[in-house]
């Protein structure tokens, strides 16, 4: 049993997690462009300090043969079967590895012959067959085993995109009862057996959940924490304070005997506000709710409901804010630059060890996503311009004030070096028009540096720079924005 307390007033607070001591690696997502542009883009991802490239969607339905039935003679576990169409993915994987990146392949969308009968949802979403998915993943893992033709090794495999949404997996409920979590668990287990069967060091990433759902799940989707609890067979119960009658703690217990085979649980914690924003409804999960998700995962691990030969990790495999400009409803770029550094700090504090930014470059303004690290150029990739947030993503640094008494304020310093490697980092404060040294910190082997200092008088801005002078962070103000942005992901409201 795991008990998690809330605030004394009964309101939920950010769940307390032991101060993280591990790494916080980064990645960037990729939306397909002509192959000629891949090399430039992937080099930019690496230059952004990222080690991972998320390739999504890897549409099973686009690689496998189409139609209502499997073709005669089709060998679904054979990566060389002529019915498969791998060439586009081959090109992306080869270019990513050549750029020094680790590809994460997010597999989704079933071919028609691998769906359940009587489809009521969108194409590729309806009761995807766990056994047929396993055969496809066997072929894919063999193809990218590092020993097939001239193709490189792929180790990281995400199973489905946002399976708690009707858009990607249906039905969410059957007869008014939750259905998708149990079906998804079967898919995860089949996928894990297939991928680990090819190579035991393959990493199976589960979850990939969207941040928002509704209680009547079939109208839209299942709340991500509720979905997670059902997949991992954990029940949650609120315990009410006897005086206030409000929930003062949560108790997590095993809810069934089913086991889930997964190496990483991942989430997409988009927000309607800044880095500490919590979803309005309990069960949904934005950035400020990651501690709650971590508590569910910890409870499942403690109950031995999760089966893995590896240390089970918690990742954010998709996140971003649209920026203004170019999106008139996006986050003002100066505010977003601050928030990117703080987002990486807050996710690290919640036990997240990998964060991937949704896309590298903006889409045109007549499309949905202007959340890239680069502004879209007028004449193609070569004319793209980096946004100020790129430096914050590459070299995150925060200085968070904490008032101890009327006369004393502590400043919590945290950052990560651009290459996620050890070294000396100089912390500076702005005094008048000049920057003055505060102290020198040692970054650990993962590039993390941190310290607590007493706030110097008349100081608002801090920054970090590498001791060799080769790079420096964006300056971070002790004064948070007075009127922080509130809106919808991708400027949709």
Q: Where is each model-derived feature located?
A:
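Secretory targeting and sorting signals
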Residues: 1-10
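Boundary/entry segment of secreted carbohydrate-active catalytic domains
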Residues: 13-58
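Structural recognition of the beta-strand scaffold that forms the well-ordered cores
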Residues: 25-30, 51-61, 102-107, 155-159, ...
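Noncatalytic carbohydrate-binding groove/subsite architecture in carbohydrate-active enzymes
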Residues: 37-39, 106, 134, 138-148, ...
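Substrate-binding cleft and catalytic face of glycoside hydrolase catalytic domains
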Residues: 48-221, 252, 272
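Aromatic-rich peripheral "rim/lid" segments of glycoside hydrolase catalytic domains that contact
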Residues: 70-71, 75, 158, 163, ...
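Surface-exposed loop/edge segments in extracytoplasmic proteins
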Residues: 433-440
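Glycine-centered loop-to-beta-strand initiation motif
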Residues: 441-455, 464
């Amino acid at each position: 049993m795991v008990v998690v307390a809330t605030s004394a007033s009964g309101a939920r607070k950010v769940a307390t997690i032991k101060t993280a001591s591990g790494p916080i690696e980064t990645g960037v997502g990729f939306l397909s462009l002509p192959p000629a542009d891949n090399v430039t883009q992937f080099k930019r991802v690496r230059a952004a300090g990222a080690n991972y490239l998320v390739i999504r969607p890897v549409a099973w339905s686009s690689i496998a043969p189409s139609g209502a039935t499997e073709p005669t003679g089709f060998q679904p576990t054979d990566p060389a079967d002529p019915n498969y169409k791998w060439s586009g993915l081959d090109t992306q994987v080869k270019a990513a590895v050549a750029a020094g990146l680790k590809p994460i392949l997010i597999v989704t969308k079933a071919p028609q012959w691998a769906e359940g009968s009587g489809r009521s949802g969108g194409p590729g979403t309806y009761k995807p067959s766990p056994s047929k998915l396993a055969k496809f993943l066997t072929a894919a893992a063999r193809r990218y085993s590092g020993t097939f033709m001239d193709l490189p090794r792929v180790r990281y495999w995400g199973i489905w995109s946002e399976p708690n949404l009707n858009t990607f997996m249906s039905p969410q409920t059957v007869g008014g009862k939750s259905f998708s979590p149990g079906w998804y668990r079967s898919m995860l287990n089949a996928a894990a057996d297939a991928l680990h069967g090819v190579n035991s060091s393959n990493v199976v990433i589960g979850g990939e959940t969207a941040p928002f759902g509704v209680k009547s799940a079939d109208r839209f989707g299942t709340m991500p924490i509720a979905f997670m609890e059902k997949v991992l067979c954990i029940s949650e119960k609120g315990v009410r304070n006897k005086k206030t009658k409000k929930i003062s703690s949560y108790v997590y217990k095993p809810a069934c005997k089913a086991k889930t085979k997964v190496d990483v649980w991942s989430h997409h914690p988009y927000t309607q506000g800044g880095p500490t924003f919590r979803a309005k409804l309990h069960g949904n999960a934005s950035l400020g709710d990651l501690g709650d998700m971590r508590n569910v995962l910890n409870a499942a691990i403690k109950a031995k409901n999760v089966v893995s030969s590896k240390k089970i990790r918690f990742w954010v495999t998709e996140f971003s804010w649209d920026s203004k400009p170019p999106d008139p409803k996006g986050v003002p770029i100066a505010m977003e630059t601050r928030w990117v550094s703080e987002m990486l700090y807050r996710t690290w504090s919640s036990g997240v060890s990998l964060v991937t930014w949704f896309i590298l470059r903006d889409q045109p303004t007549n499309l949905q996503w202007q959340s890239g690290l680069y502004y879209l150029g007028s004449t193609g990739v070569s004319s793209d311009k980096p946004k100020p947030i790129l430096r914050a993503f590459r070299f995150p640094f925060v200085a968070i004030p904490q008032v101890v008494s009327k006369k004393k304020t502590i400043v919590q310093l945290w950052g990560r070096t651009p290459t996620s490697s050890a070294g000396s980092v100089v912390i500076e404060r702005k005094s008048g028009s000049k920057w003055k040294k505060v102290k020198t910190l040692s970054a650990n082997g993962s590039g993390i540096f941190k310290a607590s200092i007493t706030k110097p008088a008349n100081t608002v801005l801090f920054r970090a720079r590498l001791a060799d002078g080769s790079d420096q962070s964006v300056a971070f103000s002790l004064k948070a924005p007075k009127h922080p942005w509130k809106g919808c992901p991708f400027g949709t409201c």
